[in-house]
Amino acid sequence: MPVSTFRVARRRFASIGLAVIASTLLLTTSTASAQDVMTKESAAVVKAAFLADLEVMRGKFIGLAQAFPADKYTWRPMDGVRSVSEVLMLIASEGYGFAPTGLGGKAGLTREEMAPLSKVTDKAQVIDHLTKGFAHAKKEIESIDPATLTGKRRVMGQDRALPDIVIAIGGDMHEHLGQLIAYARTNHVVPPWSK
């Protein structure tokens, strides 16, 4: 895809995402807004938008994981900064844990089972965990009744409404996607969607 076409597509996707969020926020503003309660319908829209975003991220993270040569999985830009495999395994862990539990779903692994994941550097194992982590998040989030998402939940030490939660989780994952894109470009790895 030519760069100009990619930019237009990216802007269009961002505009659609912002429109969905704006529409959701407008739908949630009602007489109940003083109580910070969303409607079930609004919660369903936010949940669907988050699932769609997770699917886009899944494709990009797995695409980058496949594009990186195995010998670059331990590469890091400097000491004290996550390596390629550590970023990928963090995202796998978020699929197993933070993404579904932030919305009330169940974790796919216990904390004890997740602890050693940051040490996995084998390309095939990393891709396997990414695939399983995203699949778990999707399955759990799809199973959540939107009616349970209308109020606030305690996430990251704060009471948060659903839009705040999905922005926090999605924002964190997108931040790491950007980090991984920078790692890829630094190592002359072209993101598959940019070819």
Predicted regions and their residues:
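Short, contiguous alpha-helical
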Residues: 51-55, 59-62, 72-114, 154-195
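Short, helix-capping/interhelical loops that line the mouth of catalytic, cofactor-
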Residues: 35-49, 94-158, 187-195
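Bacterial N-terminal signal peptides
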Residues: 15-29
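Sec/Tat signal peptide C-region and signal peptidase I cleavage site
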Residues: 30-34
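N-terminal secretory signal peptides that target proteins for export/translocation
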Residues: 1-11
